[in-house]
Amino acid sequence: MAFREDFVWGAASSAYQTEGFPAADGGGESIWDVFCRRPGTVANGDDGSAACDGYHRFAEDIGLLASLGLSAYRFSTSWARIDPNGDGRWNEAGLQYYDRVVDCCLANGVTPWMTLYHWELPQALEETGGWQDRGTAERFARFAGMMAAHFSGRVSHFITLNEPQIVLKLGYADGIHAPGKRLLLPELVSCWKNLMLAHGLSFRAIRNAAPEALIGIASTGKLCYPHSPADETTARQETFRLTDADWMFTHPIVLDAVCLGRVEPEPGALRGLLSAVTPAEWDTMHAVPDFIGVNSYNGSEIAAGPDGVPVYLPRPQGFACTALKWPVTPEIMAYDFAFLFDRYRLPLYVTECGLSCNDHIFLDGQVHDADRIDFLHRYLLALCRGCERADVRGFFHWSLTDNFEWHSGYAERFGLIYVDYPTQKRILKDSARWYAQTARENGKNV
């Protein structure tokens, strides 16, 4: 088995998690700057004030990525750094920073993939309602159009939103991500609608400004895989099922809206609230991307119970898990990309996949992360099988470097590159070398 000849091998990062120095050169506050100052919100009181110092060390990191033979770098631009007040008065110094990042990628033979929203909402917009306010969607579209016009000809791949599901669930429902709210269902549906409108409006703004660019969205959500071949239909149906109790962390709540122009939950309060979405709003949301990014980490094993009712099978004692206690389930790569491709019929990219390990510097000065190599090997083997049934065109490891892992702070390490935070020294982990070989051989070594 092998991947397609033009398969994209890359790594990913985000602005707040890596850059640090958000106020440098006239940058504005984001909701994460404010959230991190609230006691008890982030492990160990950590924040993104320094992060990996990517603001000053981006050239080193891009150089390391290029040295690994990776062809693409997915990163986000901080809306707050470029548009401090969310009012369209652009901070030229912030824009010039991303000029340097993009030009550095191109100089190193690396294709930049630009994510326009990876949760860096200007705090000024949160104070006027954030994603509860439709005006935020319109302001984001203005930002996206400006960015596309500015980088047209240098950036050929734009992603509108990263994981709207997580913005909604962790930021506005559970309150464990910025802005730290706990809203009720009607308010959550309003936030969802504005996020989907933001995709639709920004998609059109990017298309108008950079007609040749490819535009995607990065989705996440529950993934189910069958216990046996006889359970595949049940696992597929459960992957796309929407209920009042289980709708925010699902792919169809985003992808059905943008790809199909409709969302059809089971009977309940959610269905009633969605019935108030106007035909014009559905039309705006319905902006079919050129590709779908899938952020894939783990899933659930499903069997068909009596009358086909899905049964979530318990994980056996000692089941493999990551340092974050996320289960290791490579089966999702074999099945769920086929499920997604069959439903949406669009090219797919793995825009995030990786794990947190208890990485440390060994006595020999190196970082030996055998768990990450094994994880990647298993997931890529399964993805090879998935490629037989789906149009999968690339894989971006999450993440390029260790970084600020949101409410977990710096306790979790996802990178191919180890960051010694006191010194900001970078060390290639063993997994980086393994992944580099995999990219060179286009996966033939898996």
PLM regions and their residue ranges:
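A common structural microfeature
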Residues: 6-8, 55, 72
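Active-site region of glycoside hydrolase catalytic domains
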Residues: 1-42, 66, 85-87, 95-446
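Catalytic domains of carbohydrate-active enzymes, especially glycoside hydrolases
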Residues: 57-78, 287-292
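Glycine-rich, proline-tolerant flexible connector loops at the mouths of alpha/beta enzymes
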Residues: 77-90
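Active-site mouth loops of central-metabolism enzymes
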Residues: 43-57, 131-134
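Internal amphipathic alpha-helical repeat/solenoid segments
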Residues: 54-63, 84, 94
